[in-house]
Each structure stands twice: as structure tokens, then as C-alpha cells.
Amino acid sequence: MADTAITPTRSQNYPEWYQQVIVAADMAENSPVRGCMVIKPWGYAVWENMQGVLDRMFKDTGHVNAYFPLLIPLSFLEKEAAHVEGFAKECAVVTHHRLKGDGNGKLIPDGELEEPLIIRPTSETIIGHQFAKWVKSYRDLPILVNQWCNVMRWEMRTRMFLRTAEFLWQEGHTVHATAKEAQEETLQMLNVYSEFAEQYMAMPVIKGMKTPDERFPGAVDTYTIEALMQDKKALQAGTSHFLGQNFAKASEIKYLSAEGKEEFAWTTSWGVSTRLIGGLIMTHSDDNGFVVPPRLAPLHVVIIPIYRNDEERAQVLDYVKALEKDLKAQNYVGSSVRVKIDDRDMRGGEKAWQYIKQGVPVRVEVGPRDMAKGEVFVGRRDRGPKEKASMERNAFVANITNLLQEMQDGLFERAKQMRDESIKTITNLQDFEKYFSGGENTAPGFAKVPWCEAGMGHELLAQLKVTPRCMPLDQEPVQGNCIFSGKPATKWVLFAKSY
């Protein structure tokens, strides 16, 4: 029998380990459509918790929700040249509006559309079209809108949650009277994402600006939060874009200023997706399955009653129901502790391993002997599966929120220590090549490099399969020359292999 619940382990085959964690935790599965996944109830419950927190944070910063069409006229994308060029290869196109029988029991497309429709890869163009109708005067500004929806981008190499053809996300779109307001909005939402990643996902991130070659198509500036996974590859976890007046001009978003002058507006967009669940898995999970930070866990505590006969069953169930009630009366991060009693007709060990693989933070086993002593037997997901301890029942209830927060903080600190130990300052091309030359499936972490725009697109990057992740916002002065061009460096840039 394997020593761990997941095979292969992280050290044996990290990409396959990742897929097996998703299967073992019963989070998602592949669908009949290539590149599209089924998000199962446990995985979707994590997404719902993410949605709930983010939605509140958006509303606390003045945003409201709306919904815009899935289908976008091709001509809308063509209005913004850089935008359409950036997404052209990923677009799914609808060309017909009905089906008909071919006489042999098969269905074929019929009724060709006058203009092809694009299944949204992102919604700047169609939302911009609507904003142009909504904005007449400076009094109509700002517009601060978010939508929760699905998007479609054909992907050749798919991986559940991390990179799928269809995925769920939120996209925020805002319109402002001045560049300054739009830039402030862009950074405000970057900070919202950073706060969410660190305080709820327990995933440390680096806030930064993308280099020009990595910007969102059509953006003036793209800001990002970058995380480092356990295999030392980077993950772009969220982006916020200052679009300048590019999309406003393409969509004719104009307003009459207080001085009576017609002006083009300034816009932003920002988004995160179900890719965050992939980041959550790869930041915290271990060789026994998913590890989910308590603040996002669908369940905080699972109670497993242990008994040998009907008489013991009745007594233990009464005891654990009272325990469940007392635990639910405790408040953790603004809501009741989420508790479940698992009374299925299964061995206790089987149940425990299911919840270990699903990442439930706290497992509680209660049998007649525990009940007689007024105790509970507690296991924590951030420790080994055999590390369990008896606790006095009332003390456990009183301490549950502290225990959950201790686990949350511990997961963050562990991930931060790993990240911080995996950033290396490199000031010459030879050391850079050596740092990243371990092969396609090995990554050392972040390389912090002196850089200038003349060094963009260096041929060595493609050979090493390394990309610039960001120019960190927290920059110390850079000295010396860009390692790629030899010209004076202007910024420190983080490079890494990435997802």
C-alpha cells in the first residue's frame, strides 16, 4: 500500500500529482468537449466562497453587478486592432443560427449569419458599446460595473482549473473622466486582488506591472499579482488593466465635460477566474490531497461518530449533534463555523481519508469513550494524518475559531517562506542561463534581473521557456546594465517559468 493518498507524489511527477489531487478531492472532471471541465460540487463550493468574498470587496469599493451578452459581433472586435490581434487565435466563432436534417439522420448547420458572432473571450468591446450609450455627461461618471460569467478561449494544452477553453470569471469594467481616476481605479483593484489572495487564499503574491510585451492586448498598462507554486513555477493570479482612451475611442465613449467640451473617457478592466482554484491547489496541497485554507473551505469541521451498535449510535449521535450546534454558534470571519456530521454507514477510517483528500481543515472523531470523558479526538489537515489529539470538548468549541485562524496564518507563512527563499538576484546573462537550465519540468523560482525595454524578446527566453512576470511595484533603485541588451537598466524585473 502507498504511504500517501496521492500517487505520484509531488516530487515524482508534479503535473500528474496536480491532476490526481483534483480527482481525489472530487473537485472536477473532464467533459466530452475537449478543454472544457465539469466543476463538481466540492470544487464549485470553493468557487462560491471565492465569489462571495470578492463580490463583497467589489461592492465595498463602489462597484455594482450587471450582465452582458455572451455573443459579440465580429465587427466589434475589429474596432480595436491590438485587441483583436491578441485574441484572434483563441476565438470561438458562431457562423450559423440553426440546424437542419440532412435526410440521413444527421444534423448540419443551416442559416448562415450575415455577420459571424464571437463567443466572448473577454467583454471590453461589447461592454464599451453599451457604455457609449450610458455616458453623455461628466455627471454620468464614473461607471463602476462588474459581471460574473463564463468566457471561451480555445486552448491547445489544457489543464483543469489552470487553463481550460471555457472558464468562469469576473470581469470589472469602469469608465472615468480623467486618466488619474482611471489609474487610481486600476491600482485599487490590484490591491483588492492582492488582499484577497493573501488574506483569504493564504497565497503570497508580488504586485507588479507587466512589461510591454506581456500587456493585455490594447491596454496602456497591465498590472498583475504573481504567485509562486510549490514546483517553483509562477502563476499569474489576477490582472488589472489601465486601458487609457484606446477602447473609449474604439467604442465612441464620449462625455460632455463641466466646461462644455466633448471628451473621450478613460477606461479600465480587471479580472480573476477559476484559475485561482488551481493556484490554491498548487500553493498548499500535499501528497495526501487538497489543502484548503479555512477562510475558503466549504466545511470547517467534519464530525465522524464512532460506534459499534445501535445503542452506542443513538448516544453518540445525541452527543455530536449538541457539539455541532455549539460549533455552529461560533463566528469565524463574519459567519458561522461550517460543520457537518457524517453518519454514513461506512468505516470511520474511510470517511476520515475522504475528508483528508478533500482538505477539510478539522476532523473530529467521537466514540463512547470520548463521550464518557467529555472529550473529542481532533485531527488537523495542516498536519500529518496520524497526528491526532484528544481535547476537552468545551475547550475545543471555545478554541475552534483560534484554531482555524492559526491554520490560515500557518499556511500563509509556510508559502511565503518558500516564495521568499526562491527569489534570486541575477546580474549577468551566464548566471541567468545557468539558473533556468534545469530542463522543461524543473523550475528554480524567480530571477530578479536588471532590465530595460531594449532587452525585450531576447532569444534566450524562448529557449529556456522563461517569461518576464512583472516589474515589482516595490522597487529599489536599479544599477548597472540590462543583462539582455547591455544598455543601462531602468527596472528590476522578475523572470520565471510559469503556468
Curated annotation (Swiss-Prot):
Primary site of residence: cytoplasm
GO biological process: prolyl-tRNA aminoacylation
Catalyzed reactions per annotation: tRNA(Pro) + L-proline + ATP = L-prolyl-tRNA(Pro) + AMP + diphosphate
EC number: 6.1.1.15
InterPro entries hit by this protein: aa-tRNA-synt_IIb (IPR002314), aa-tRNA-synth_II (IPR006195), aa-tRNA-synth_II/BPL/LPL (IPR045864), Anticodon-bd (IPR004154), Anticodon-bd_dom_sf (IPR036621), Pro-tRNA-ligase_IIa_arc-type (IPR004499), Pro-tRNA_ligase_II_C (IPR016061), Pro-tRNA_synth_II (IPR017449)
Assigned keywords, A-Z: Aminoacyl-tRNA synthetase, ATP-binding, Cytoplasm, Ligase, Nucleotide-binding, Protein biosynthesis
Nucleotidyltransferase listed as a keyword: no
Gene3D superfamilies linked to this entry: Anticodon-binding domain (3.40.50.800), Bira Bifunctional Protein, Domain 2 (3.30.930.10), C-terminal domain of ProRS (3.30.110.30)
GO CC, one annotated term: cytoplasm
UniProt xrefs under Pfam families: HGTP_anticodon, ProRS-C_1, tRNA-synt_2b
Top-rank taxon, per record: Bacteria
Assembly and interaction partners: Homodimer.
NCBIfam families, A to Z: proS_fam_I
Protein task: Catalyzes the attachment of proline to tRNA(Pro) in a two-step reaction: proline is first activated by ATP to form Pro-AMP and then transferred to the acceptor end of tRNA(Pro).
Family: Belongs to the class-II aminoacyl-tRNA synthetase family. ProS type 3 subfamily.
PANTHER family for this protein: BIFUNCTIONAL GLUTAMATE_PROLINE--TRNA LIGASE, PROLYL-TRNA SYNTHETASE
Domain remark in the UniProt entry: Consists of three domains: the N-terminal catalytic domain, the anticodon-binding domain and the C-terminal extension.
Name listed for the protein in its UniProt record: Proline--tRNA ligase
Organism: Bdellovibrio bacteriovorus (strain ATCC 15356 / DSM 50701 / NCIMB 9529 / HD100)
Gene name of the encoded protein: proS
